[in-house]
Amino acid sequence: MSIDCLYRRSSLFDTSFVPLHSSIPATSKMSASNSDVNAPISPVVDEGKSELVSPTLERLVAPFNCSPSSTPLQDVAGVGSKMSDTLWMGDLEPWMDATFIQQLWASLNEPVNVKVMRSKASSSETLISYCFVQFSSSAAAERALMKYNNTMIPGAHCTFKLNWATGGGIQHNNFVSRDPEFSIFVGDLLPTTEDSDLFMTFRSIYPSCTSAKIIVDPVTGLSRKYGFVRFSSEKEQQHALMHMQGYLCQGRPLRISVASPKSRASIAADSALGIVPTSTSNRQPNQDLCSMDPLNTTVFVGGLASNLSEKDLQVCFQPFGRILNIKIPFGKGCGFVQYSEKSAAEKAINTMQGALVGTSHIRLAWGHNTLPVSALSQSQSQVSDEGFDRTLSANQIFGMNQSVIGANSGSSNSSGSSLKSAPVSPRTAAAQSLLPNSVVSSINGMNSVNFSTISPPPLSRSASISPTLSGSGSGLTPLSSHFPSAATGLVGGQVYPQSSVLQSSKINGSAKVQPSVKLPEWLQPFSGNNHNSFATQDLLTRVSSLKLVDDEQPASLNGSAFQARASRPWNLGRERQSSLIDLRHELEQNENGLEKSGFGLNLRGRLPPRSYSTFNCTGQYLQPSLRLSRDS
């Protein structure tokens, strides 16, 4: 049952019907009413699009005790022998002009004259949401009222709101004052609740309740699940605010708060700009709940043009703070912008309310977080984009959650924010160390990467330095690092290289490091006296990423002969960016020289048919942790 069914024309009323509490005789009330027959009356508007009460409506109610402050019933103009041929038509959309309304009634086989009321407070011809429709006869007007009132308008997402026009009819003058009315906001309504349901809920308790209006979405025509109820008595309005909180309407508890209506002049001015009203009553449903939630950082953006994208919204809302997520549902004409901080969302709502974005003015309100609370709290705990100062530990540099140099290169100094880890390729430490973007590339004329000092245990000859050698499932691809001269040297026959590979082996529990094992003597000259040389840097880099197979010096060499050979090693620096296959190729080229010198005897027979790396200064050879093709 619609709310308009609760009204009837005053001419149908018995003139002797007056409220029981009134002490004024019926005749005096009629005379007072008839004295103002031609006084134009304008409807009161809570929002820019709709009237809560038609100016000519009277309520048909049983006699009851009314509040002394209730406005007495008044007769309407036009009471007499002749019925009016003009109807009042309200709740018009801003785009409905006189041409549309006239064509609308013509499609219904009703020839009419239409006069759309325009705002006098604005220089532009702005619609103020109602008009007057004059029919060919009073019977035609009455037939249209009974047939089309509260039915859907063809081609629009709204219904006909019809009633008899007041005194002057087409000569109706707007913006005339009337008795004050007091509104309350009602939220948490069911989607199926209608105006009449909300009205009867309050009218059954408060006789001064004059109207109820549920707000609908202008695009979809669906209920927004909140509305406004108006009273002629301020006392009953205040009583409803206190005692109707949680009152059941169709089984749903109501949420009551004060509505702050805007003046008609202000509404007309906003309508001239195409701005949706932004009064407290409009923002009330979201502000009461969502704005009190400290974790809610999402802004609802309504009135978006269909050609706007997420990138356009980002440009408009990015100045107010860091944006976590932007979403524009397809075909809804709205969007959601989620910030990392609540203060940024508040600033955006206060600043961008009613702003022109694209070709339309937007309306803002509190929405609901599109990201889970866990993701939001994690984002708020991170460091801001402006930068931060902290010292990176070994685990942060080489751990799971940091970038693996060579797989995802980038600077890792102490003043930059951490990078996300990239997918790790199945390269070994030796191969990664030979890539141009690895740490070792610094010794080839490239920019070096400075890390904080790390002090791992001494290098073990029996331990698998790379975690990939021990069958670990960690998925890490540790990289070798060149050893700064200040941090590398022989201390009691032990070498302490500053290597990321050692740190990775320390993290991996399957690679057990023996803390006090000396390197083979044939490596000590390179790590001792000549550790500043280019060839030594290259040698130690490769040793840090390979597993020792034969730790002892050749039996064919005594100590003096070994020292003599060790004092003049082949220069392997030219191979600093070669792969293991390239090293094998160099070995084959030098085999004749090795066999002639006497300490590379039977080297060919000792090499299995796969790629190996060797150091030509001794009979030792190093087994790579993983064979690679040239293009891997």
From Swiss-Prot:
Gene3D superfamilies: 3.30.70.330
SMART domains for the chain: RRM
Organism: Schizosaccharomyces pombe (strain 972 / ATCC 24843)
Gene giving rise to this polypeptide: csx1
Start and end residues of each RRM domain: 85-167, 182-261, 297-369
Low complexity biased stretches: 466-476
A Gene Ontology molecular function term of the record: mRNA binding
Compartments it resides in: Cytoplasm
Complex formation: Interacts with cip1 and cip2.
Keyword RNA-binding: yes
Modified sites of kind Phosphoserine: 42, 54, 67, 69, 291, 455
Job description of the protein: Regulates global gene expression after oxidative stress. Interacts and stabilizes atf1 and pcr1 mRNAs after oxidative stress, thus controlling their turnover.
Listed GO biological process terms: 3'-UTR-mediated mRNA stabilization; cellular response to oxidative stress; positive regulation of gene expression; regulation of mRNA stability involved in response to oxidative stress
InterPro entries: Nucleotide-bd_a/b_plait_sf, RBD_domain_sf, RBM42_RBP45_47-like, RRM_dom
Name of the protein this chain belongs to: RNA-binding post-transcriptional regulator csx1
Disordered: region residues: 456-476
Keywords annotated in UniProt: Cytoplasm, Phosphoprotein, Repeat, RNA-binding
SUPFAM superfamilies: RNA-binding domain, RBD (SSF54928)
